[in-house]
């Protein structure tokens, strides 16, 4: 500790000299009035010194008592020494009353820096230097040469820089003096802090401030422990920390909420009970959860007050608390009602507050304060932030144990305000949006064919057009037709900008019209006289015509090139799977996490020479996915089949950056059984390869279509068709599943019940059961069959995968059967291989705006507002369910994507129940297609429902099997699983197209 203290005395000397050379002899009486000022502020920029025009949050200015010092070269003004902590930020400012213009020049270590003098409202010259994030490299002399019409001047500042990394100040704590009934206040810090007791005889908030009720004692030991409010405070160069002696006063009315004391494991506990009575005939006791405290964990003191009443206190203490010290501490007296306090022992600190974003709108001069109500332990350090500038934060305790921080110094500026708080264990951020109401301001203009008006204001203004008669200023007749209001735009945290246009042919020429914009703040109007424009001149001169064409042709060529370039760039590769950060309660209050600045973890790197490429699995405009054999990617000496995702050979830097961002996101995402998981990557010495799991059966869409002829509603039908040829496999295991009745994530998988080294902890029967189940799955795949239970299982697995993505704050944005892959055991995995799909020729992707979008799978808010959330993925999941239970029919069959399609979506149109879906499954689809995204189910809810459906299906199958081959036509006959008759045939895809055309 002594070595640290010696090192802490090391100070960096920073001389900032504002130098002015005298050009003429002056006396003390002739010297101008110069004031040197120090302004401390929060860090907002780089560490280099910047002129005063750099925006910062300034604290109260401190006068440095600038005095003249005679030198042979002229007059030098010297200010008091300034101390600033390393990484601190200050502004050194000189105010001088001198006539005429000023010019200045900063010089630092023989290098010139810019200088911008200005004048304040008192016509004083102001020269400032902001020194931000002070470091050792900034030690030295700063010279500022200021020249005025009268003379030149020099001012000297001396700044000491402290190394704050060696400075510490910890919150003080109490300890009982040995063999004495007294408290010792201890605070650890560098430099060594000074300790004082702050005693107050009042219960009011004034105890925290200077006042007549406050008594200060600069000593470490306190013997008088009868005061109303007792605090121990420690102070050093870093600031001030205080700890209050927690007290229950039996003479005070109990609080409306039970007082609560928080401590962390290992901290000391001190809790005081105080009571006053007319005589000494009473006692005090402490109990913890109705059990008296042990001897030696408390001590009692008593004294008589000035009015001869007895004051008695009982202090309970624990030198180092543990979790067993949590509970209700009750102080009882024979003359007073008992009172309790809840002591909570924490493993680490916390900050509890509502983090949802809040939005306010106020008048331009309305008084308003932001406020945050929170509960925290330990005490927080907080700040308010606006426009990258920090403002001081004040916090005040409330009676219910909460604290509140208010910010009123916003000067009615619109924008986003942030409250940031932290303590040793937690961080908290809350965002506010402030809108300032403003009356619209209208600007008008007229052209040959129309008159238009524009306005800005808040709230969004509305428009009216009125006709005036005989050029009278009284315009009362409203113009109902020929008015077109353009969609309003909003400046960032500012006013709404809107416009309205009147078609002159509708109103007639030669009229006086008035356009008015109005909102809750008032109305603003402009009057326009509509002239009658003459006919457009007809071009008769062929020479002029061809000359015009010749001049325009180069511009047309350039325009075509630009359009082609834009068309090429607009379809740039981007991963559909994105991780989002929600910033507020509304659907559009989020942003995509940008992984470009994240570091790539090289533990995922795989030697590219260990890849042996095979066939191309898919190829598109941006790249391709290839099958490959990876040697040693899962286990040394073992090769497995993988899918390798790569860009095309001539990919640009933006596409390469997008692929690297996708790689970093996948490394953060983690592993899940129903996601195509990342296995590794090749990023060094060549093109970027992303190595994923290989799914042998391709995408779910084509898988379903290929199994249409092999689909059976029940396993009973399969038994009959195959003459029970594989039933003996299960005869020895009557409790095992039917082929295809997989428990997909309904029970823990085998690898989760095994040790880390793979040694199973299952019994032999369980192992045999798993082996038989795997054999059943392989035999089922050989039979090339598909059942209703398989469809239900596919839906459940996709919901599980999306539940995982929702937990990871990811949105897929292109959830469809074509983006779900099938592998062994009919396990399905969600993927994003969009770069290997030719979206230019894929009919599922339709041009909308400047992008190709999977319109028929998109939620209304995504389609019309560009908003993508997990709830929009729920809508897409409903479309995916329709694909599954129609065995791969295109959604909205027979309905082309045109203006009528968008109207259908906006009107709430929903597809009919697919042939293979039950009423329950169709109900899930309809729930997913709720127009209001808030009414759609979450993926955990979908997983739970489908899991129950799957379990019921298996249970029904077991009951109907009864250990023998069933003779009934359907194992589902007792639960009405299908909405059609069991014997009916599904309509063909062409027939389904016809049905939808008729109903739409």
UniProtKB/Swiss-Prot annotation:
GO molecular function, one term: cytokine receptor activity
Stretches assigned to the Cytoplasmic side: 565-992
Residue(s) carrying Phosphotyrosine: 573, 590, 592, 600, 727, 769, 796, 845, 958, 972
Disrupted gene: phenotype observed: No visible phenotype. Mice are born at the expected Mendelian rate, develop normally and are fertile. They show normal blood cell counts, excepting reduced levels of primitive B-cell progenitors. Mice lacking both Flt3 and Kit show a reduction in both lymphoid and myeloid cell lineages. They appear normal, but are born at a lower frequency than expected and exhibit severely reduced viability after 3 weeks, none surviving more than six weeks.
Keywords carried by this UniProt record: ATP-binding, Disulfide bond, Endoplasmic reticulum, Glycoprotein, Immunoglobulin domain, Kinase, Membrane, Nucleotide-binding, Phosphoprotein, Proto-oncogene, Receptor, Signal, Transferase, Transmembrane, Transmembrane helix, Tyrosine-protein kinase, Ubl conjugation
Entry keyword annotation includes Cell membrane: no
Cellular localization per UniProt: Membrane; Endoplasmic reticulum lumen
Domain (Protein kinase) ranges: 611-946
InterPro entries hit by this protein: Ig-like_dom, Ig-like_dom_sf, Ig-like_fold, Ig_sub, Immunoglobulin_dom, Kinase-like_dom_sf, Prot_kinase_dom, Protein_kinase_ATP_BS
Top EC group: transferase
Domain Ig-like C2-type, residue spans: 254-344
Region annotation (Disordered) ranges: 45-67, 968-1000
All ranges on the Extracellular side of the membrane: 28-544
Membrane topology (UniProt): Single-pass type I membrane protein
PROSITE patterns xref list: IG_LIKE, PROTEIN_KINASE_ATP, PROTEIN_KINASE_DOM, PROTEIN_KINASE_TYR, RECEPTOR_TYR_KIN_III
Catalyzed reaction equations: L-tyrosyl-[protein] + ATP = O-phospho-L-tyrosyl-[protein] + ADP + H(+)
UniProt function note: Tyrosine-protein kinase that acts as a cell-surface receptor for the cytokine FLT3LG and regulates differentiation, proliferation and survival of hematopoietic progenitor cells and of dendritic cells. Promotes phosphorylation of SHC1 and AKT1, and activation of the downstream effector MTOR. Promotes activation of RAS signaling and phosphorylation of downstream kinases, including MAPK1/ERK2 and/or MAPK3/ERK1. Promotes phosphorylation of FES, FER, PTPN6/SHP, PTPN11/SHP-2, PLCG1, and STAT5A and/or STAT5B. Activation of wild-type FLT3 causes only marginal activation of STAT5A or STAT5B.
Subunit structure: Monomer in the absence of bound FLT3LG. Homodimer in the presence of bound FLT3LG. Interacts with FIZ1 following ligand activation. Interacts with FES, FER, LYN, FGR, HCK, SRC and GRB2. Interacts with PTPRJ/DEP-1 and PTPN11/SHP2. Interacts with RNF115 and RNF126.
Residues given in the record as ATP binding sites: 617-625, 645
EC id: 2.7.10.1
Protein name: Receptor-type tyrosine-protein kinase FLT3
Species of the source: Mus musculus
Phosphoserine: residues bearing it: 575, 760, 1000
